[in-house]
Amino acid sequence: MEAIRHDWTLEEIEDLLNTPLLELVHRAQTVHRDYQPANAIQLATLLSVKTGGCSENCAYCPQSAHYNTEVDPQSTLPIETVLEQAERAKAAGASRFCMGWAWREIRDGAQFDAMLEMVQGVRQLGLEACVTAGMLSDRQAERLAEAGLTAYNHNLDTSPEFYGEIISTRTYADRLATLERVRQAGISVCCGGIIGMGEGQRDRAGLLQVLATLNPHPESVPINALVPVEGTPLGDRDRLDPLDLVRMCAVARILMPKARVRLSAGRTALSREAQVLCFLAGANSIFYGDTLLTTANPVCEADRQLLADIGAEALEVVTA
């Protein structure tokens, strides 16, 4: 069994990314079986509670107010609607319900109070609850923990070196500080990134190094493939080679054996076979539902059929 480490070097991670694919997947699957249930995939449903109008300028994001896309700003969904969606997600087989707000940061007031009620309601349904809503204060993190929040998502997106090519309205240090506030409050960290934005292999290694040297490692690591959206600065990027996604999943599994590696945005561009390769490489969580915030996702029926065809089952979680 490979030991869990927090001292991975950039060179070691680059070497892993450049390992022959079959050898890499074999090693990742070996690590996976040492630390994870062999044939269980967590189903997580993601709902956009507040869509569009975000003041950040993330180059990939159609929700940014800086770009002219087909995503129009919408009002925040009411608590009742969100909890109804959570009930449907549970009935469909999801064990985690993730809620997203297109905000730069959380602000105190009625909308934050509503968020806390949503978290409490989701947990009362027996689901894990995850929130992604930008930066937050120490006290806000504490209140989310008191409400029962399972995990807070705050992605790093890419390496520190490439980050400035993607966003200028928030620093890398801001993101790391948010992760530390979440961790100090006793909330699990959900943190990953996006590939296919024009970054090099060293940038992918750099992202993974930052994640893998966090102590403890993130509880879950979303690996996203860029979904090019017309109107954003990255709208004309070519689609990612699916094998690059397999490599990222495999290396993430080797570096962070206990994390849930979540195969996230971009799955609609993957064949069934490519998705299975990602599972073989150590991915053990997917977003489950027809939409990911504002981009398409495979329908639930297709995912259920895929899991059945490969003999996998939905991961069951125990919630307090």
UniProtKB/Swiss-Prot annotation:
**Assigned keywords, A-Z:** 2Fe-2S, 4Fe-4S, Biotin biosynthesis, Iron, Iron-sulfur, Metal-binding, S-adenosyl-L-methionine, Transferase
The family database entries (CDD domains) matched by this protein are listed as: Radical_SAM
Q: Which domain of life is it from?
A: Bacteria
Which InterPro entries does this UniProt record tie to the protein? Aldolase_TIM (IPR013785), BATS_dom (IPR010722), Biotin_synth/BioAB (IPR002684), Biotin_synthase (IPR024177), Elp3/MiaA/NifB-like_rSAM (IPR006638), rSAM (IPR007197)
Q: GO: which molecular function terms?
A: 2 iron, 2 sulfur cluster binding; 4 iron, 4 sulfur cluster binding; biotin synthase activity; iron ion binding
The free-text function statement in the UniProt record for this protein reads: Catalyzes the conversion of dethiobiotin (DTB) to biotin by the insertion of a sulfur atom into dethiobiotin via a radical-based mechanism.
How is the subunit organization of this protein annotated in UniProt? Homodimer.
**What is the protein's given name?**
Biotin synthase
